[in-house]
Regions:
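Transmembrane beta-strands of outer-membrane beta-barrel pores
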Residues: 47-53, 79-81, 90-96, 131-137, ...
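Repeated loop/turn-to-beta-strand initiation elements of outer-membrane beta-barrel proteins
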Residues: 81-84, 122-125, 171-174, 221-224, ...
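Residue-level signature of outer-membrane beta-barrel architecture
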Residues: 73-77, 117, 166-168, 212-216, ...
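Residues that define the transmembrane beta-barrel architecture of outer-membrane proteins
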Residues: 63-69, 105-109, 154-160, 202-208, ...
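Outer-membrane beta-barrel "beta-signal"
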Residues: 249, 277-295
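Membrane-embedded beta-strand positions of outer-membrane beta-barrel proteins
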Residues: 43-45, 86, 127-129, 162, ...
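Outer-membrane pore/translocation modules
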Residues: 103-207
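Extracellular loop and loop/strand-boundary signature of outer-membrane beta-barrel proteins
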Residues: 56-61, 96-101, 144-150, 194-200, ...
Length: 295
C-alpha cells in the first residue's frame, strides 16, 4: 500500500510539473507573440558646416560660411503579411559669401509612404504616396535683377498609385507602379510654369513610376545611400523621363562626427530644360534619436 501510494504520488507530482512547465512555456510564447515589436523607428539629425576666410591673401579669395541642417526620420511597421514604410526627408541650407550676402543652398521637404501586402518571398502588392516641396523662395542669381524661381508650396508635387514592391531588406527595395497619378500645385505667380497651364494652379498627369532605395557599407565606417525615382507621363511626351537621383556618402569619425558627401541630380523638363545638379561636402555633427527603437 505504501509503495502504491508513493508510486501514485510520484506520478501526480510528475504530471503537475509537466503541466506547470507546459503552461509556463505557453505563457512565454503568448507573451513573446504579444510583445513582439511591430514598429521600428529611426531618426537622424545632422548639422553640416564648411567655412573659408582670407586676409591679405595674395592670390585673392572670398570669405564664405555655409551650413546645412538635415533631418531623416524612418517609420517601419511589420505585422504578418503587412509592411508599411514611411520616410521623412527634409533639409535647409544657407551660405554667406562676402559681397554677395546670404543665399539658399538647400531647401527640401519630402514625405514618402509605401504600404505593402506580401504575396511571396520579398514581393508585395503595394501602394505608394509621395509629397515634396520646399519651404522658402528660391532665386536665379545669374539674372539681373534676380528672378524668383520657386516659393513655399510652389511647386508642390503629390504622387500616388498601386504597384509591385520588391523588398529584400530595409536597405534594399524597388517599387514599380505602372499607373501612378501625380498632381502639381503652384500659386498664381507661377501659373503657366512647371507643367501647369496658364491661369490654373494645378496639373494632373498619369504615368509610370519607379522608385528604389539601396544602402550598403563600402568599408568599415563608410556607408553609401542611393535614392532614385523615375517618372514617365503617359498623357504628355512619354519619351521624357523625369529623374531624381541622390547619393549620400557618410564617413564616420566617431559616434557624433561624420563627413558628408551628397550628389543630387534632377532631370525634369517642366522645371528646367537643363540637367540640375547639386553637390555638398562638409563635416557634420550627427545626433541619432530613437535609433532602431521598436515598440
Amino acid at each position: 500500500m505504501t509503495h502504491f501510494n508513493l508510486f501514485t504520488l510520484n506520478r501526480i507530482l510528475l504530471i503537475l510539473c509537466l503541466l506547470l512547465v507546459s503552461n509556463s512555456y505557453s505563457q512565454d510564447k503568448e507573451k513573446d507573440t504579444i510583445l513582439k515589436p511591430k514598429w521600428k523607428v529611426n531618426g537622424r539629425l545632422a548639422f553640416i558646416f564648411n567655412q573659408s576666410s582670407f586676409s591679405n591673401w595674395a592670390s585673392g579669395g572670398q570669405n564664405t560660411l555655409a551650413g546645412n541642417i538635415n533631418l531623416n526620420y524612418d517609420f517601419n511597421y511589420k505585422k504578418e503579411n503587412i509592411n508599411w514604410d514611411t520616410r521623412i526627408i527634409t533639409g535647409y541650407g544657407i551660405s554667406y559669401v562676402s559681397e554677395q550676402g546670404y543665399r539658399k543652398t538647400d531647401d527640401r521637404f519630402e514625405l514618402n509612404t509605401l504600404l505593402g501586402l506580401k504575396t511571396s518571398t520579398n514581393w508585395f502588392l503595394s501602394f505608394i504616396g509621395n509629397f515634396k516641396t520646399q519651404y522658402t523662395k528660391g532665386f536665379d542669381y545669374k539674372q539681373e535683377p534676380k528672378s524668383m524661381v520657386s516659393g513655399f508650396l510652389a511647386p508642390a508635387y503629390l504622387t500616388f498609385g498601386p504597384g509591385m514592391l520588391f523588398k529584400k531588406s530595409d536597405e534594399l527595395s524597388l517599387n514599380i507602379a505602372p499607373a501612378t497619378a501625380r498632381y502639381t500645385f503652384v500659386n498664381d505667380f507661377f501659373s503657366g510654369k512647371f507643367g501647369v497651364e496658364e491661369g490654373k494652379n494645378t496639373a494632373f498627369s498619369l504615368g509610370f513610376n519607379l522608385s528604389g532605395y539601396y544602402k550598403f557599407s563600402i568599408m568599415k565606417n563608410i556607408e553609401m545611400e542611393n535614392i532614385i525615382t523615375m517618372y514617365s507621363d503617359y498623357l504628355a511626351n512619354i519619351g521624357n523621363v523625369d529623374l531624381d537621383y541622390q547619393t549620400n556618402i557618410r564617413f564616420k569619425v566617431n559616434s557624433h562626427i561624420k563627413m558628408h558627401i551628397t550628389f543630387h541630380t534632377i532631370i525634369d523638363d517642366n522645371s528646367s530644360s537643363k540637367i540640375q545638379f547639386r553637390q555638398l561636402f562638409g563635416l557634420g555633427v550627427n545626433y541619432n534619436f530613437h535609433e532602431k527603437r521598436t515598440f
